[in-house]
Amino acid sequence: MKFFLDTANVEKIKEFNALGLVDGVTTNPSLIKKEGRDFYEVIKEICSIVDGPVSAEVIALDAEGMVKEARELVKIAENVVVKIPMTKEGMKAVNTLSNEGIKTNVTLIFSANQALLAAKAGASYVSPFVGRLDDVGQDGMFLISEVMQVFGAYGIETEVIVASVRHPIHVLESAKMGADIATIPFDVLDKLFNHPLTDNGIAKFLADWEAHTNR
Protein backbone atom coordinates (compact mmCIF):
# COMPACT_ATOMS: atom_id res chain seq x y z
CA MET A 1 0.00 0.00 0.00
CA LYS A 2 1.20 3.47 -0.84
CA PHE A 3 1.38 6.24 1.76
CA PHE A 4 0.38 9.76 0.80
CA LEU A 5 0.87 12.61 3.26
CA ASP A 6 -2.28 14.64 3.85
CA THR A 7 -0.80 18.06 4.48
CA ALA A 8 0.48 21.25 2.89
CA ASN A 9 3.23 21.63 5.51
CA VAL A 10 6.42 21.63 3.46
CA GLU A 11 8.73 20.92 6.40
CA LYS A 12 6.76 17.83 7.40
CA ILE A 13 6.74 16.63 3.81
CA LYS A 14 10.53 17.00 3.68
CA GLU A 15 10.90 15.17 7.01
CA PHE A 16 8.91 12.09 6.01
CA ASN A 17 10.10 12.11 2.42
CA ALA A 18 13.68 11.79 3.72
CA LEU A 19 12.59 8.52 5.35
CA GLY A 20 11.34 7.16 2.04
CA LEU A 21 7.76 7.06 3.28
CA VAL A 22 6.01 9.57 1.02
CA ASP A 23 4.56 8.18 -2.21
CA GLY A 24 2.48 11.29 -2.82
CA VAL A 25 0.72 14.24 -1.16
CA THR A 26 -2.88 15.38 -0.90
CA THR A 27 -3.85 18.96 -0.14
CA ASN A 28 -7.11 20.88 0.12
CA PRO A 29 -8.04 24.54 0.58
CA SER A 30 -8.22 24.15 4.39
CA LEU A 31 -4.70 22.67 4.58
CA ILE A 32 -3.31 25.40 2.32
CA LYS A 33 -4.99 28.07 4.47
CA LYS A 34 -3.22 26.71 7.57
CA GLU A 35 0.14 27.44 5.95
CA GLY A 36 -0.73 31.08 5.24
CA ARG A 37 1.07 31.02 1.89
CA ASP A 38 0.24 31.50 -1.77
CA PHE A 39 -1.58 28.44 -3.12
CA TYR A 40 0.44 28.07 -6.31
CA GLU A 41 3.76 28.58 -4.50
CA VAL A 42 2.96 25.83 -1.99
CA ILE A 43 1.90 23.32 -4.65
CA LYS A 44 4.97 24.10 -6.75
CA GLU A 45 7.30 23.58 -3.78
CA ILE A 46 5.62 20.32 -2.78
CA CYS A 47 5.93 19.04 -6.35
CA SER A 48 9.65 19.81 -6.29
CA ILE A 49 10.09 17.66 -3.16
CA VAL A 50 7.87 14.68 -3.96
CA ASP A 51 8.15 12.59 -7.12
CA GLY A 52 4.70 11.05 -6.74
CA PRO A 53 1.24 12.53 -7.30
CA VAL A 54 0.36 15.82 -5.59
CA SER A 55 -3.37 16.54 -5.38
CA ALA A 56 -4.41 20.19 -5.70
CA GLU A 57 -8.09 21.06 -5.41
CA VAL A 58 -10.23 23.29 -7.58
CA ILE A 59 -12.47 25.94 -6.03
CA ALA A 60 -15.07 26.37 -8.78
CA LEU A 61 -18.40 24.57 -8.42
CA ASP A 62 -19.37 24.49 -12.09
CA ALA A 63 -17.81 22.10 -14.60
CA GLU A 64 -16.53 24.85 -16.89
CA GLY A 65 -14.81 26.62 -14.01
CA MET A 66 -13.31 23.38 -12.69
CA VAL A 67 -11.88 22.49 -16.09
CA LYS A 68 -10.42 25.98 -16.49
CA GLU A 69 -8.74 25.79 -13.05
CA ALA A 70 -7.52 22.25 -13.70
CA ARG A 71 -5.77 23.26 -16.91
CA GLU A 72 -3.89 25.94 -14.97
CA LEU A 73 -3.02 23.63 -12.08
CA VAL A 74 -1.38 21.00 -14.27
CA LYS A 75 0.94 23.67 -15.64
CA ILE A 76 2.61 23.84 -12.21
CA ALA A 77 4.29 20.43 -12.50
CA GLU A 78 3.88 17.08 -14.25
CA ASN A 79 2.92 15.30 -11.02
CA VAL A 80 -0.08 17.50 -10.19
CA VAL A 81 -3.36 15.62 -9.86
CA VAL A 82 -6.50 17.75 -9.91
CA LYS A 83 -8.84 17.24 -6.98
CA ILE A 84 -12.52 17.48 -7.94
CA PRO A 85 -15.55 17.33 -5.60
CA MET A 86 -18.08 14.50 -5.97
CA THR A 87 -20.93 16.38 -7.64
CA LYS A 88 -22.70 16.07 -10.98
CA GLU A 89 -20.79 19.12 -12.25
CA GLY A 90 -17.63 17.57 -10.86
CA MET A 91 -18.18 14.38 -12.82
CA LYS A 92 -18.77 16.39 -15.97
CA ALA A 93 -15.40 18.06 -15.39
CA VAL A 94 -13.71 14.73 -14.64
CA ASN A 95 -14.96 13.28 -17.91
CA THR A 96 -13.62 16.26 -19.87
CA LEU A 97 -10.27 16.22 -18.07
CA SER A 98 -9.91 12.46 -18.46
CA ASN A 99 -10.36 12.82 -22.21
CA GLU A 100 -7.59 15.44 -22.16
CA GLY A 101 -5.24 13.09 -20.28
CA ILE A 102 -5.39 15.10 -17.05
CA LYS A 103 -5.38 12.99 -13.88
CA THR A 104 -8.10 13.60 -11.31
CA ASN A 105 -8.78 12.69 -7.70
CA VAL A 106 -12.48 12.77 -6.82
CA THR A 107 -12.87 13.87 -3.21
CA LEU A 108 -15.62 13.93 -0.58
CA ILE A 109 -16.87 10.44 -1.38
CA PHE A 110 -19.17 8.90 1.22
CA SER A 111 -20.78 5.99 -0.63
CA ALA A 112 -19.75 3.16 -2.93
CA ASN A 113 -22.21 4.48 -5.52
CA GLN A 114 -20.34 7.78 -5.59
CA ALA A 115 -17.01 5.97 -5.99
CA LEU A 116 -18.42 3.92 -8.87
CA LEU A 117 -19.77 7.02 -10.62
CA ALA A 118 -16.41 8.76 -10.28
CA ALA A 119 -14.58 5.76 -11.71
CA LYS A 120 -16.99 5.56 -14.65
CA ALA A 121 -16.50 9.28 -15.32
CA GLY A 122 -12.78 8.62 -15.69
CA ALA A 123 -11.29 9.51 -12.30
CA SER A 124 -7.70 8.41 -11.74
CA TYR A 125 -8.30 8.25 -7.98
CA VAL A 126 -11.28 8.26 -5.63
CA SER A 127 -11.05 9.44 -2.03
CA PRO A 128 -13.62 7.89 0.35
CA PHE A 129 -13.67 9.73 3.70
CA VAL A 130 -13.64 7.24 6.59
CA GLY A 131 -13.19 9.51 9.61
CA ARG A 132 -16.08 11.78 8.76
CA LEU A 133 -18.38 8.77 8.39
CA ASP A 134 -17.25 7.52 11.79
CA ASP A 135 -18.07 10.98 13.19
CA VAL A 136 -21.75 10.60 12.25
CA GLY A 137 -22.07 7.08 13.64
CA GLN A 138 -21.41 5.14 10.44
CA ASP A 139 -18.63 2.63 9.79
CA GLY A 140 -16.12 4.39 7.57
CA MET A 141 -14.04 1.29 6.93
CA PHE A 142 -17.11 -0.62 5.72
CA LEU A 143 -17.27 1.89 2.88
CA ILE A 144 -13.70 0.98 1.91
CA SER A 145 -14.58 -2.72 1.88
CA GLU A 146 -17.58 -2.00 -0.38
CA VAL A 147 -15.55 0.11 -2.81
CA MET A 148 -12.76 -2.48 -2.99
CA GLN A 149 -15.32 -5.24 -3.61
CA VAL A 150 -17.04 -3.34 -6.43
CA PHE A 151 -13.81 -2.22 -8.08
CA GLY A 152 -12.37 -5.72 -7.80
CA ALA A 153 -15.47 -7.33 -9.32
CA TYR A 154 -15.18 -5.24 -12.47
CA GLY A 155 -11.43 -4.78 -12.71
CA ILE A 156 -11.75 -1.02 -12.29
CA GLU A 157 -8.32 0.59 -12.49
CA THR A 158 -9.21 3.77 -10.58
CA GLU A 159 -7.07 3.79 -7.43
CA VAL A 160 -8.66 4.06 -3.99
CA ILE A 161 -7.21 6.66 -1.63
CA VAL A 162 -8.46 6.16 1.93
CA ALA A 163 -8.96 9.70 3.23
CA SER A 164 -10.01 11.38 6.48
CA VAL A 165 -7.67 9.01 8.33
CA ARG A 166 -7.85 9.70 12.07
CA HIS A 167 -5.74 7.00 13.73
CA PRO A 168 -3.39 4.06 13.03
CA ILE A 169 -6.25 1.54 12.99
CA HIS A 170 -7.61 3.23 9.87
CA VAL A 171 -4.24 2.69 8.19
CA LEU A 172 -4.01 -0.97 9.22
CA GLU A 173 -7.58 -1.76 8.18
CA SER A 174 -7.00 -0.04 4.83
CA ALA A 175 -3.96 -2.22 4.20
CA LYS A 176 -5.84 -5.39 5.18
CA MET A 177 -8.63 -4.52 2.74
CA GLY A 178 -6.18 -4.01 -0.09
CA ALA A 179 -6.70 -0.28 -0.55
CA ASP A 180 -4.22 1.22 -3.00
CA ILE A 181 -3.34 4.25 -0.90
CA ALA A 182 -3.94 5.81 2.51
CA THR A 183 -3.47 9.56 2.76
CA ILE A 184 -2.31 10.19 6.30
CA PRO A 185 -1.94 13.35 8.42
CA PHE A 186 1.61 13.64 9.74
CA ASP A 187 0.53 13.29 13.38
CA VAL A 188 -1.10 9.94 12.59
CA LEU A 189 1.92 8.80 10.58
CA ASP A 190 4.11 9.62 13.58
CA LYS A 191 2.00 7.27 15.71
CA LEU A 192 2.68 4.34 13.36
CA PHE A 193 6.27 4.28 14.59
CA ASN A 194 5.34 3.77 18.23
CA HIS A 195 4.64 0.77 20.43
CA PRO A 196 5.23 0.67 24.21
CA LEU A 197 6.99 -2.71 23.98
CA THR A 198 9.46 -1.24 21.48
CA ASP A 199 10.28 1.54 23.96
CA ASN A 200 10.54 -0.95 26.82
CA GLY A 201 12.79 -3.21 24.77
CA ILE A 202 15.18 -0.39 23.90
CA ALA A 203 15.32 0.70 27.55
CA LYS A 204 16.06 -2.89 28.64
CA PHE A 205 18.81 -3.36 26.04
CA LEU A 206 20.46 -0.09 27.05
CA ALA A 207 20.23 -0.92 30.76
CA ASP A 208 21.75 -4.36 30.18
CA TRP A 209 24.55 -2.89 28.07
CA GLU A 210 25.33 -0.24 30.67
CA ALA A 211 25.45 -2.89 33.41
CA HIS A 212 27.74 -5.02 31.25
CA THR A 213 30.19 -2.23 30.43
CA ASN A 214 30.36 -0.97 34.04
CA ARG A 215 31.39 -4.32 35.53
From Swiss-Prot:
One GO cellular component term: cytoplasm
Active site: 83 (schiff-base intermediate with substrate)
Any coiled-coil regions, as ranges: none
InterPro entries: Aldolase_TIM, TAL/FSA, Transaldolase_3B, Transaldolase_3B/F6P_aldolase, Transaldolase_AS, TSA/FSA_arc/bac
Pathway(s) of this molecule: Carbohydrate degradation; pentose phosphate pathway; D-glyceraldehyde 3-phosphate and beta-D-fructose 6-phosphate from D-ribose 5-phosphate and D-xylulose 5-phosphate (non-oxidative stage): step 2/3
GO biological process: carbohydrate metabolic process; pentose-phosphate shunt
Keyword Transferase: yes
Alphabetically ordered keywords of this record: Cytoplasm, Pentose shunt, Schiff base, Transferase
GO MF assignments: aldehyde-lyase activity; transaldolase activity
Cell compartments where the protein resides: Cytoplasm
Domain of life where this protein originates: Archaea
Tagged with keyword Transferase: yes
EC code(s) of this entry: 2.2.1.2
Reactions catalysed, as given in the entry: D-sedoheptulose 7-phosphate + D-glyceraldehyde 3-phosphate = D-erythrose 4-phosphate + beta-D-fructose 6-phosphate
Role summary: Transaldolase is important for the balance of metabolites in the pentose-phosphate pathway.
PANTHER family the record matches: FRUCTOSE-6-PHOSPHATE ALDOLASE 1-RELATED, TRANSALDOLASE
HAMAP family given in the database record: Transaldolase_3b
Stated family: Belongs to the transaldolase family. Type 3B subfamily.
Protein name listed in UniProt: Probable transaldolase
Biological source species: Methanococcus maripaludis (strain C5 / ATCC BAA-1333)
